[in-house]
C-alpha cells in the first residue's frame, strides 16, 4: 500500500537532480500504484488520466484515445444520421442483414471521414449532421480540441526533457 509513496520519493530525487526522463517514469509508476489505493470518484479520475495521457508521461495514450474517439463517433454517426450531398445515412440495426457489405463499408468510410474532420474541427461542410448527430458532433469537436491539446502538451513535456 505504501509502494506509491516510495515511487513518489524516488521521482522527487531524480527530479531534484535534474534527471527528468527517469523522474517522469517514476512519476508514472507512482500514479499507477496510487490508483490502486484509491476508490470512488478519485479512482475514476485517476483511471481517466491514465487512459487519456498516461499521467502526462505517455503521449501515445492521447493519440490512441483520440483514434478510439474518432472510431466510436464514426460508428455512432451511422445510426444517428448524417447527410452527404442530400443522401441521408441513418441506419437501423435490422438493415444490416439487408444491405450489401460494400454499401455499409462505403457509408462507414464516409462516416469515419466526417468524424475525423469533426474531431479536428476542420468542418469542411460537405457532410452535414442531422438529428442527434448535431449534438454529438459538437461533443466530438470539444473532445477533439481537448485531446489535441492534451497530446501536444504531453508530447512537448516529453520532448523538452
PLM regions with names:
Residues 1-39:
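Disordered, glycine- and acidic residue-rich low-complexity segments typified by the G-patch motif
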Residues 13, 66, 142-145:
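Residue-level hotspots within the lipid-embedded alpha helices of multi-pass solute transporters
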Residues 25-28, 50, 114, 137:
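Short amphipathic alpha-helical coupling elements at transmembrane boundaries
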Residues 35-47, 94, 103-110, 130:
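Coil-to-alpha-helix initiation sites in intrinsically disordered, low-complexity, charged segments
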Residues 40-80:
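Transmembrane alpha-helical segments and their cytosolic interface motifs
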Residues 67-111:
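Outer-pore turret/helix-boundary of cation channels
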Residues 99-161:
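Pore domain of cation channels
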